[in-house]
Amino acid sequence: MSLSRWISVLVLVISTVPVLMAQAPQLPPSQSGPASVATKAQPANPDFAQAQRLLQQGKYDEAISQLHQLASQNVKLPGVSRELGAAYYKKGDYQKAAEYLKPAIQEDPKDGEAVQLLGLSYYLGGHPTDAIPYLERVDTWLPRANVDASYILGICYIQTKDYPKARKAFARMFDVPPDSAASYLFTARMLLRQEFQPIAEEYAQKAVTLDPKLPLTHFLLGELYLFKSKIPEAITEFQKELSLNPGHAATYYKLADAYSRVQKFDDAERLLQRSIWLDATSTGPYILMGKVLDKKGETELAVRALQRALAMDPNNPVTHHLLGQAYRELGRNEDAERELKIGGQLQQRQDQKE
C-alpha cells in the first residue's frame, strides 16, 4: 500500500470516532491518487510471500508466527523487522509494531513506509510526542495537495499542546496563510473536536478579530457557548452568523436548539422549518422539531417529525426513545413499548462499542 493511502485509511478510521459535537463537519480521507514520495521501493521478497498472504486474509497471528520463525532461522534476514512491524500494525498492536519498525528504519533509513508506520504506531498507541518527528518527515514527502498527513500531524501538535505548529499544519492542509483568519478558524474547529474548548474559543475569537465577516466563525463560537450552556451568548453568535451567512441550514438548527433551551418553542419551530427547507437530509432538525412540538402539546405532529427522522436513520436510539414517549402520551402503549425497547437495545449496543 502506498504512503498516501496508509494515511488516508487512518483518517477514515479517525473520522468515525465519536466527537464532542455531533454536527461538527467530518474530514473525509483524501481521494487523490497515490502520492509521489521520496521513498525507496521495497522489492518483493519470496521469503515473506506466505506471511503476506496470511495478512491479506486477516490471519495476523499466523503471519506473525511465521515471520518470527523466519527470523529465528536467519537473524540477519533483510526486511524481517519491517515485515513484523507492518504485521503488528495491521493487527492493531501498535507497541509491538513500533518495537520492530525502529530497527527496520535503522536498517534502511530511506524506507518511507516504515518511517510512516512508526509515526502512526506511536500516534495510535497514544504517544504523539514520539510520533511527531516521523510524521514531520512524512509530511515533507507528500505533495501539497495531500491533506491527510497534515491533518494527523496537526492533531499530534494539539495533543502535545503545540498550538502554533498545529495551526501551521492545518493552514497547509487547507492551503491558506498560517496567520490568516481562516487558519485560526480551521484550528479552532479541530481543537473543538479534540475537546480543547478554551483554546478553541481563543482561536475562534482571534479569527473574528482578524476577519469579523468570515463565514462560520460566529457559528463555531455559538456552538461553543451552547455546549457551555451560555445560551444568551450562543444566541447572539448564531444571529451574527445568520446576518453574514443566511443560507446556512445548520445555523438555523443550532439557533433553534438555543431557543428551545429557554422555552421559546414558537421561535424554535420557525427556525427549524427554515433549516429543513434549506437541507432536508439532516436528521437533527427533525428530531429537535419532534421535541419542540411535543413541548407545545402538538404530539401528533411531533410523531410525524420523529417518524421522518427514523426513516432517515433507523439506528438512532434517541429518536426511538422520543417516539416511544410521544406514543405513550397518545395512549398508543403497544407502539410506545416497542419503540422504547428498540431505543434501549440500540443504546446498549452503542455503549458496548464505546
For each of these PLM feature ranges, what is it?
Residues 57-65, 90-103, 125-137, 160-172, ...:
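Structural signature of tandem alpha-helical TPR/SEL1-like repeats
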Residues 83, 117, 151-152, 186, ...:
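Canonical tetratricopeptide repeat
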Residues 73, 107, 140-142, 175-176, ...:
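Structural marker of alpha-solenoid helical repeat scaffolds
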Residues 27-35, 318-354:
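Terminal, low-structured helical/coil segments at or just beyond the last alpha-helical repeat
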Residues 43-76, 86, 90, 155, ...:
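Alpha-helical segment of the N-proximal tetratricopeptide repeat
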Residues 44, 78-79, 112-113, 145-148, ...:
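Helix-start (N-cap) detector for alpha-helical repeat units in TPR-like alpha-solenoids
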